[in-house]
From Swiss-Prot:
Pfam families: Ribosomal_L34. Belongs to the bacterial ribosomal protein bL34 family. NCBIfam families: rpmH_bact. One of its GO terms (biological process) is translation. It comes from Photorhabdus laumondii subsp. laumondii (strain DSM 15139 / CIP 105565 / TT01). GO terms for cellular component: ribonucleoprotein complex; ribosome. GO terms for molecular function: structural constituent of ribosome. Keywords: Ribonucleoprotein, Ribosomal protein. PANTHER family: LARGE RIBOSOMAL SUBUNIT PROTEIN BL34M, MITOCHONDRIAL RIBOSOMAL PROTEIN 34 FAMILY MEMBER. The keyword Ribosomal protein applies. This is Large ribosomal subunit protein bL34.
């Protein structure tokens, strides 16, 4: 049986990366929340 998680760095960054977050208003809200919380890593991208 094929598993559901087939890792791909490109797909990961396109959907959850920093530039993807910055592209929408809600994505920017996500970053703002994570900054306020003090997260070391704001997004999955390096």
């Amino acid at each position: 049986m094929k598993r559901t998680f087939q890792p791909s760095v490109l797909k990961r960054n396109r959907s959850h990366g920093f530039r993807a977050r910055m592209a929408t208003k809600n994505g920017r809200q996500v970053l703002a929340r994570r900054r306020a919380k003090g997260r070391t890593r704001l997004t999955v991208s390096k």
